Curated annotation (Swiss-Prot):
Pathway: Porphyrin-containing compound metabolism; protoheme biosynthesis. It is found in: Cytoplasm. Its main location: cytoplasm. It catalyses: Fe-coproporphyrin III + 2 H(+) = coproporphyrin III + Fe(2+). It comes from Corynebacterium glutamicum (strain R). HAMAP family: Ferrochelatase. It is an enzyme of class 4 (lyase). One of its GO terms (molecular function) is metal ion binding. It comes from the Bacteria. The gene is cpfC. This is Coproporphyrin III ferrochelatase. Keywords: Cytoplasm, Heme biosynthesis, Iron, Lyase, Metal-binding, Porphyrin biosynthesis. The lineage of its organism: Bacteria, Bacillati, Actinomycetota, Actinomycetes, Mycobacteriales. Fe(2+) binds at H189, E276.
Length: 370
């Protein structure tokens, strides 16, 4: 075992949601996602259809490995030596397994990148819970690693500028006669209103949806668009529970009925093209658009880009300097703390305001992959 005694950060853990990588993994993955939530087995069968449609493979693990490869390349370009590990909440490689490997390798003081730009329970606090679980697991093995989670990065200049370029790329793909009239629509994962109200500190108020709206405004401004929409997708809770609205497909239908012929849809809430992007947008939204002879250009996500890797290394350097360097927004960008501690007093409340993410009445019932 390597002996590392320095207080400097000596590793990065990319911590994500996880997803199956074969037909035989779909059902146990879904059982992990919904454990303790009382979801009927037949609902899991319904949701599994989405994954089996794509060969039983969620793209999220491969996309995260691509992010890791890009981060390693960016670290090397800055003459940095920092090993990068990969762990998930719901599927292999599990966070506990990654933490064990890190401890075995002699890691003492690791940074954690959660694959979410946002505040709130699902986007931030649940990753803090994952970190606490990893620490508890290591303690049961007689091992120890200190984990420091990186902050929320929804308004980092590289995030905004790269998303703006990707939006412009989508506009360029539209037919000439539709480009000027195309409507720009930003979309992010819907959550229950109670969860949004609890996001951030009591003083923040609805931090998650506010961050999504601010990021969208920053990107639109960079593109040169003054009028745009922010909508939501992937709702999967009880139909009796209020969630963030409107839904992207419902909104597209409404716009079309008012005469809109073209949309540029930017999945600002998602780092990579995982299941909810390729199902809810590339399948369901596109099918509805085709029925209506509506042209929709879906904007690429930021995760696979070199600029996103540079953003991650920027965040690492911020953590080393113990101060935030680059921000464009005015809202809080919380989320950084040690060993899963609350990042701010009262942040995200004490209750888990999320509901089970498999719903028989939802348009899309695929589990979330933040």
């Amino acid at each position: 075992m390597n002996e590392r005694t320095s207080d400097a950060f000596d590793a990065l853990l990319v911590l994500s949601f996880g997803g199956p990588e074969g037909h035989e993994e779909v059902r146990p993955f879904l059982e992990n996602v919904t454990r303790g939530r009382g979801i009927p087995p037949e609902r899991l069968d319904d949701v599994a259809v989405h994954y089996h449609h794509f060969g039983g493979i969620s793209p999220i693990n491969a996309l995260n490995r691509e992010i890791i490869a890009n981060v390693e390349k960016e670290l090397a370009s800055r003459n940095r030596e920092l090993p990068v590990y990969f762990g998930n909440r719901n599927w292999k490689p599990f966070g506990n397994e990654a933490a064990e490997q890190m401890a075995d390798d002699g890691v003492k003081n690791a940074l954690v990148l959660a694959t979410s730009a946002w505040g709130g329970y699902s986007g931030c606090q649940q990753y803090q819970e994952d970190i606490r679980g990893m620490i508890k697991h290591l303690e049961s093995q007689g091992q120890s690693v200190t984990f420091t989670k990186l902050r929320q990065f929804y308004d980092h200049p590289r995030f905004v500028s790269t998303m703006a370029q990707l939006v412009q790329d989508s506009y360029a793909k539209l037919p000439d006669e539709l480009r000027d009239e195309a409507r720009l629509v930003f979309t992010a994962h819907s959550i229950p209103l109670a969860a949004d109200n609890a996001a951030g500190t009591p003083q923040d108020g609805s931090l998650y949806s506010s961050q999504v709206k601010e990021a969208s405004a920053l990107i639109a401004k960079a593109v040169g668009v003054s009028d745009f929409d922010v909508v939501w997708q992937s709702r999967s809770g009880s139909p009796h529970t209020p969630w963030l609205e409107p839904d992207i497909v419902d909104h597209a239908v409404e716009l079309n009925e008012k005469g809109q012929k073209a949309l540029v849809v930017c999945p600002v809430g998602f780092i990579s093209d995982h299941m909810e992007v390729i199902w809810d947008l590339d399948s369901e939204l596109m099918e509805e658009a085709e029925k209506r002879n509506m042209v929709v250009e879906r904007v690429a996500t930021v995760g696979p880009t070199d600029e996103f890797a540079a953003l991650v290394v920027d965040l690492i350097e911020e953590a080393e300097l113990k101060r935030v360097i680059e921000r464009l927004g005015k809202l809080p960008a919380r989320g950084s703390s040690i060993n899963g501690a609350p990042c701010s007093e009262g942040c995200c409340g004490t209750a888990k305001h999320q509901t089970a993410r498999v719903n028989p009445n939802a348009r899309s019932a695929a589990p979330a992959a933040n």
